[in-house]
Amino acid sequence: MSQKTMKALVLEEAFHLNLKDVPLPEVPPGYARVKMLAISICGSDIHAYRGNSLLLTYPRVLGHELCGVIDEINGAPGDLKVGDRVSVFPYLSCGSCVACRQHRENCCTSL
């Protein structure tokens, strides 16, 4: 029987973390799922924890700098295969706005 849930440290609201079982995410076509091995907390996570970000919604799972192992693939492009060790670039970006051209994809103005 395959695992159907995973552990997640959920920030329910400012200053309130809750370790809980959450459903294992489905893998949509063209994507791969990564089983986390290590996750880092950065300044934006601290701001979220303290409630200092106006753009933030709760609940949320902190930690967007991570590495892991691919555990499922659903037609993902490229040379990916189950068992590959990967790190994740956590930002979607347009690649052409001022912020993206300055390698500050986390500040992309087009998304």
Residue map of PLM features:
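Short structural boundary motif marking the start of a folded domain
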Residues: 2-9
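Residue-level signal for short segments within beta-strands and strand-turn junctions
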Residues: 10-12, 50, 101
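Short, surface-exposed acidic/glycine-rich loop or hinge patches that mediate macromolecular interfaces
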Residues: 13-16, 91
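Short N-terminal binding/cap micro-motifs at the start of the first secondary-structure element
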Residues: 15-19, 43-44
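Generic structural detector for well-ordered beta-strands
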Residues: 21-23
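Glycine-rich beta-strand-centered segment in the early N-terminal region that forms part
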Residues: 25-39, 52-101, 106
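Cytochrome P450 core scaffold surrounding the K-helix E-X-X-R motif
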Residues: 44-50
